[in-house]
Amino acid sequence: MINLDTIIYNVLDSIAPTYQGYPLNWNELPVISYVCEQNSSAIKAAEEITDYIVYKIDLFCNIEDDDIGMCEDINRLMNNLGFTRQQCVTLQEEGGVHIVFRYYMYIDKNNRTYSKIYRY
C-alpha cells in the first residue's frame, strides 16, 4: 500500500491552508481539505504490484477570492504528481464557493504512475 498523504498535503498547502478531513478553522478562507477515498490493489501477483488511489479535494473560498486561479493551481499540481482529474463540481453556498475535485491514479511500487491499467 502506497501512502501519498504527506505529498498531497505539501502540494495543496502551497496554495492555501490545508487540512486532512474537515478544516479546523472556518473563519479564514480560502481553505483546502483532502481525504484519500480509495487505496486498493489494482494488480496483484505474489505481492501487490499496482495501487489504485483516489483523492477527494475540497476548496472552500469567499466569492471574492480567485477560485479559478486556485482551481488551476490544484489541477496543475495534481497532474504534475501523476493524477488524473475525474470530477470537478462547483457549489454555490451561503457567502462562498465550495469546489469539489476527485483525482485518481494508478501507481506501482517503483512510483511510476498510470492513467489506465490494461489487463491482458
Which residue ranges define each predicted feature?
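Short, charged interaction patches at domain edges and termini
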Residues: 1-5, 26, 37-52, 86-120
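Small/polar-rich, solvent-exposed N-terminal microdomains that initiate assembly or binding
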Residues: 1-44, 62, 70
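Short secondary-structure junctions
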Residues: 16-21, 80-89
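Residue-identity detector for glycine
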Residues: 21, 69, 82, 95-96
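A short beta-strand signature
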Residues: 53-57
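Mid-chain, well-packed structural core segment of small domains
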Residues: 58-84
